[in-house]
Amino acid sequence: MKDPQAPVVSRPVFLPTARAQFAAAYPEVPHKLAHALADHPLLGIEALARLGEALPPGAVEYNRGDLPIGVDGKPAATGLTIGETIRRIDTTASWAVLKNIEQRPDYAGLPAALLGELRPAIEARTGSMLKTQGFVFVSSPEAVTPYHFDPEHNILLQLRGTKVLTQFPAGDARFAPDSVHESYHLGGGRELAWQDNFMPYGTPFDLAAGEAVFVPVMAPHFVRNGPAVSISLSITWRSEWSFAEADARGCNMLLRRLGLNPRAPGRYPARNLAKATAWRTYAKLTGRR
């Protein structure tokens, strides 16, 4: 039985050089950094299959992995269970994500332990870490995670296999139109429309076990797995800056409905407080959230 007092990680995952690289680039510059989390016993195939079976249905997502870069809506399901998908991931042509792993006791301290190593650099720039979460991705050989964006600050740690994560500039409306940002923050999907002429503007990050990449808030990206099974861990967090950017998008949606063409929220260090406050006031008065 696992000792409840045992540390989740027994040594630092991010060494001083990696922490310095992160501090210099955060929160807007995507970059690679080294980590020492490979071969963790909680992150092997059988352990993850059991985790997937233990998580509530809303915390697992799995579907076909033999996809194009761009898809219209959610990809199709495979007909397998989450346990079958992960245990047979080498042959199922699938992609699976286990969400909010911190809700399970054995995994509760893992995202916190890793983010704790980076807390000083994070809080010096964007203040308190909010809504810290962990996500595990298990992918078949050559699987594709289609083009999308995410609202969190994100570090993706590669644990097994290889993949290429290709990022595009965050906040550039060529790659994610303002109207799509606005609809996402009001409950729309995170999938984005792909055009082949985007490719020259992307920055590919080749990842092998022991390497990680930082993905800024709402930076469009897609992922292509290598020729072997891949396991990756995302540790994510929100900040008051990221929430203000999202709420400013909500305000812009209201302005757009009035026939205006509002300016997009500024990227860090712009604070977007006026529009964020206006949206929060509107939301409170109308019961939006």
Segments predicted by a language model, with ranges:
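A gly/proline- and charged-residue-enriched helix-loop-helix capping module
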Residues: 102-136
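Short glycine/proline-enriched turns and hinge-like loops at secondary-structure junctions
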Residues: 148-151, 158, 168, 225-228
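Conserved short histidine dyad/triad with adjacent acidic residue
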Residues: 135-149, 168-172
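A short beta-loop-beta micro-motif enriched in histidine and acidic residues
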Residues: 131, 144-154, 200-201
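N-terminal auxiliary "cap/dimerization" subdomain that precedes the catalytic jelly-roll/cupin core
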Residues: 1-95, 287-288
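Double-stranded beta-helix
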Residues: 158-214, 219-220
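Conserved double-stranded beta-helix
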Residues: 204-206, 235, 239-289
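A short hydrophobic beta-strand segment most commonly corresponding to one strand
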Residues: 178-179, 227-243
